[in-house]
């Protein structure tokens, strides 16, 4: 039985998500789920979250991002799915 291929979740998080510990919180949740990737502040106020791992764990992270228990205030999350394109080690704040 072969392992499921890894997927890549790219989530654009809109709202009051900078300067409130959002990237740190996201990193902690991603590491708990065994995901790799990063969370980065963008000049327009969004946070870009890139996570790679199993589809199930990436979906769990997306649910947490949309769930309302994050630091700050999330107004919406736009998610894009693709195959894991590169090898990423760890989960980092950028």
Curated annotation (Swiss-Prot):
This enzyme's EC code(s): 3.6.1.7
Single GO MF annotation: acylphosphatase activity
Keyword entries, A-Z: Hydrolase
Catalytic activity: an acyl phosphate + H2O = a carboxylate + phosphate + H(+)
Name of one Pfam family that matches: Acylphosphatase
InterPro entries: Acylphosphatase (IPR020456), Acylphosphatase-like_dom (IPR001792), Acylphosphatase-like_dom_sf (IPR036046), Acylphosphatase_CS (IPR017968)
Record-annotated disulphide pairs: none
PROSITE patterns hit by this protein: ACYLPHOSPHATASE_1 (PS00150), ACYLPHOSPHATASE_2 (PS00151), ACYLPHOSPHATASE_3 (PS51160)
Domain Acylphosphatase-like: 8-94
Keyword Hydrolase attached: yes
Active site: 23, 41
Broad EC category: hydrolase
PANTHER family xref list: ACYLPHOSPHATASE
Record protein name field: Acylphosphatase
UniProt source species: Mycobacterium sp. (strain JLS)
């Amino acid at each position: 039985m072969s392992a499921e291929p890894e997927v890549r979740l790219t989530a654009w998080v809109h709202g009051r998500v900078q300067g409130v510990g959002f990237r740190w919180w996201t990193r902690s949740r991603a590491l708990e789920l065994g995901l790799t990737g990063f969370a980065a502040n963008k000049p327009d106020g969004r946070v870009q979250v890139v996570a790679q791992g199993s589809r199930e764990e990436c979906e769990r992270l997306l649910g947490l991002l949309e769930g309302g228990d994050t630091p700050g205030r999330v107004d919406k999350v736009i998610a894009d799915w693709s195959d894991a394109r590169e090898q990423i080690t760890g989960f980092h704040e950028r």
